[in-house]
Amino acid sequence: MNTNTLLIENKKAKFNYFIEEKISCGIVLKGTEVKSIKAKKLSFNNSFAIIKKEELWLENLHVSKYKEGNIFNHDELRPRKLLIKKKELQRLKKFKEKEGYTLIPISFYLKKSIIKVEVGICKGKKLYDKREILKQKSIKKDLSREIKYK
């Protein structure tokens, strides 16, 4: 039985980056942030993970304010600490030292009742890579249509 429930996925990450590896980690959140994320009120635009002082931080993740929240509502763009084992952090450092690699949040999911983040070690795609993928998708669609109508 799979206990992981996908909350939200970063679809642009798969289009803009080659995902080399995925790492699951916890995230430090406030109460109203948890409720907003469970309501799928977050945006991945320009978000990334960065290593500061032997810790992994998620930057530029926009979590909307909780509608029923009061004066204790959270700051929408605050940096959020990611919880990860030291061995995995060392491995991430090695990838970050290489040219062109970045850490991008791929998805948020529930494991039992705890919110987890899947962070991908990604390398940016060039424009011609994206065009090639779009061509392959359109060819695949055309073939499936032809097969369907024959």
Curated annotation (Swiss-Prot):
Pfam families: SmpB. It is found in: Cytoplasm. SUPFAM superfamilies: Small protein B (SmpB). This is SsrA-binding protein. One of its GO terms (cellular component) is cytosol. GO terms for biological process: trans-translation. It comes from Borreliella afzelii (strain PKo) (Borrelia afzelii). Gene3D superfamilies: 2.40.280.10. InterPro entries: SmpB, SsrA-bd_prot, SsrA-bd_prot_CS. Required for rescue of stalled ribosomes mediated by trans-translation. Binds to transfer-messenger RNA (tmRNA), required for stable association of tmRNA with ribosomes. tmRNA and SmpB together mimic tRNA shape, replacing the anticodon stem-loop with SmpB. tmRNA is encoded by the ssrA gene; the 2 termini fold to resemble tRNA(Ala) and it encodes a 'tag peptide', a short internal open reading frame. During trans-translation Ala-aminoacylated tmRNA acts like a tRNA, entering the A-site of stalled ribosomes, displacing the stalled mRNA. Keywords: Cytoplasm, RNA-binding. The keyword Transmembrane does not apply. GO terms for molecular function: RNA binding. Its main location: cytoplasm. The keyword RNA-binding applies. Belongs to the SmpB family.
